[in-house]
Amino acid sequence: MPVARSSKAQSSKQPRASKAPSVTENVPPEKEEGCQAKRSPSSPQGGPKKRSAFGDITNAHKNQVVTGKKEGVKAPTRKATRAPPAPIVAKNNEINLKKSLRKTPPADVPVEPEKDSVPEEPVQQVPVVEDIDKEQLGDPYANAEYAKEIFDYMREREEKFLLPDYMEKQSDISRDMRAILVDWMVEVQENFELNHETLYLAVKLVDHYLVEVVSMRDKLQLIGSTAVLIASKFEERCPPCVDDFLYICDDAYKREELIAMETSILRTLNFDINIPIPYRFLRRFAKCARASMETLTLARFVCEMTLQEYDYARERPSKLAASSLLLALTMKNLGGWTPTLEYYSGYCAQDLHPLVKRLNFLLTYQPCDKLKAVRTKYSHRVFFEVAKTTPMDMMKLEEKLKS
């Protein structure tokens, strides 16, 4: 500040200031402050010339003389005009930016079409499908990388193995005889502790063989036991031997007859015995639903009850499995058909409702009370006693399916 300068400096430079008193009056205050801030006594250039508090007047006098001579070339106020500091410029730019944002857009620029170009409602309504194979990626025993392709291939093979109504041409075999045979095959599977896939495949082999061959009733048990033998070789790690199947038939057939029937079945089916079965789809769909073992077992019970019923033999295995799981979920009050189940099964809930009602009717009114192998099997503690679960009331079932 000019006040901080000593009085000594003022007295030493007083004669020079008196030489041009008129100039001192003409210098504006901004000029003085600018010149004072421009050069300080401590600067290298201000060393030789000691100036007083008004020492800039001499320079101002000189500047006025020069500007008087070169008035047309240089503007007199050019040196006094200074650019605002950087913080002030930034602040002004920020204020101008806010003002420009507050301005309303021109009338000719459409604003609403931008909302129409990106609709929000469809994006919110996209169903979330869970990747159920993500957790098992890299597991060589799970083959998660090919799981979807495998089941898509099985869905394609369903078309090839759809059963016609073959009972019309079987003169010596009835639906009740078939039901008795399947009930006996369930006991064989349980006694030998075979996989469920073995039982389902054996029933499929019997049905497809009877489509092509007209058989007599005295050979029906031989066909069933041989079908279990073939299915065991296809599904089991350690299948039972031929003598075991002769024993369960109470030695009603000879070894040569069993081997001859095995050859006949394989040749009749052209050795194409990889038939899609409901149980494989059921395990897949239960994984999609994150169902517990108890819920899966209830769905197994529902699905296995259909094996001895001829009317369900012509249903698609994937649809039968999906309907059994949906009925089990409804009976347990665990929700309905999720987008993940719809994606992996290929069926929406409305496609399954008629079959679900039929399955619930089957649990409520069993056609033959003498065939209790499946109910006895699933009444055990190992299977959570799911056979004792009370079937749903038909009216309540319809209400839950509609909701």
UniProtKB/Swiss-Prot annotation:
Pfam families reported in the protein's UniProt record: Cyclin_C, Cyclin_N
GO MF terms, alphabetically ordered: cyclin-dependent protein serine/threonine kinase regulator activity
A GO biological process held by the record: G1/S transition of mitotic cell cycle
Protein location: Nucleus
Motif stretch (D-box): 51-59
Entry annotated with the keyword Protein biosynthesis: no
GO CC annotation, single: nucleus
Coiled coil spans: none
Alphabetized SUPFAM superfamilies for the sequence: Cyclin-like (SSF47954)
InterPro entries, alphabetized: Cyclin, Cyclin-like_dom, Cyclin-like_sf, Cyclin_A/B-like, Cyclin_C-dom, Cyclin_N, Cyclins_cyclin-box
Biased composition range(s): Polar residues: 7-25
Ranges for region Disordered: 1-86, 102-122
Key words, A-Z: Cell cycle, Cell division, Cyclin, Nucleus, Ubl conjugation
Residues spanning the signal sequence: none
CDD domains per the UniProt record, alphabetical: CYCLIN_CCNB3_rpt1 (cd20508), CYCLIN_CCNB3_rpt2 (cd20510)
Similarity comment: Belongs to the cyclin family. Cyclin AB subfamily.
UniProt subunit comment: Interacts with the CDK1 and CDK2 protein kinases.
Function in brief: Cyclins are positive regulatory subunits of the cyclin-dependent kinases (CDKs), and thereby play an essential role in the control of the cell cycle, notably via their destruction during cell division. Could be involved at the G2/M (mitosis or meiosis) transition. G2/M cyclins accumulate steadily during G2 and are abruptly destroyed at mitosis.
Entry remark concerning the domains of this protein: The N-terminal destruction box (D-box) probably acts as a recognition signal for degradation via the ubiquitin-proteasome pathway.
Protein name from the UniProt record: G2/mitotic-specific cyclin-B3
Source organism per UniProt: Gallus gallus
Source taxonomy: Eukaryota, Metazoa, Chordata, Craniata, Vertebrata
Primary gene name: CCNB3
